[in-house]
Curated annotation (Swiss-Prot):
MF-aspect GO terms: aspartic-type endopeptidase activity
Topology within the bilayer: Multi-pass membrane protein
Protein name: Lipoprotein signal peptidase
Compartments, record wording: Cell inner membrane
Domain of life of the organism encoding this protein: Bacteria
Pathway linked to the protein: Protein modification; lipoprotein biosynthesis (signal peptide cleavage)
NCBIfam families reported in the protein's UniProt record: lspA
Organism: Rhodopseudomonas palustris (strain TIE-1)
EC primary class: hydrolase
Amino acid sequence: MTPVRLGILTAVIALALDQATKLWLLYGFELARKGVVPVTSFFDLVLAWNTGISYGWFAGQGPTGQILMLAFKAVAIVALAIWMARSTTKLATIGLGLIIGGAIGNAIDRLAYGAVVDFALFHVEIAGKTYNWYVFNIADVAIVVGVVALLYDSLIGAPAVKAP
C-alpha cells in the first residue's frame, strides 16, 4: 500500500469511527434524553455541544465565527493533505491521516449541527472533590494521537535518509 493510500485509509477510518459513535449516541442511544450516563467510576457519557474550538474556546462567536472556523479548518485540511502526500514515513502519514480524519469529523458536526458533538468525560474524585477533564469525542482522540505520532516521528523516529 502506498503511503498516500495508507494516510487516506487512516483518515477514512478515523472519520467513520467518529461519525458512527456520534450518530449512535445521538439517535440510537439517545444520549440527550438520558443525560449523564455513568460508565465507570471515572468515566461518563454526557452530551455537550461545543460551539467553540478546543476546550470551548471562542464559543458564542455566532454564524460569522462558525464560517471563519470552517474556512480555516478547510485550509488546514488541504495543507495537511499536501504534507501527507509528501510524507516520507509511515508514522507521519498515519499521524496526518488521523488529524485529517478527526478534523473532517468535527467539521461535519459544525456543518450539520452548528456545534461539535462531544460526549466522553473522564473525572476523578480527590479528597471529596470531583475534578473533570474536558468533554471530548473520537475525532479529538484521533487528532491528539496524530499529533503525538508526528512528534514522535520528527523527534525520535528513524533519521531521514541523506541525499547522495
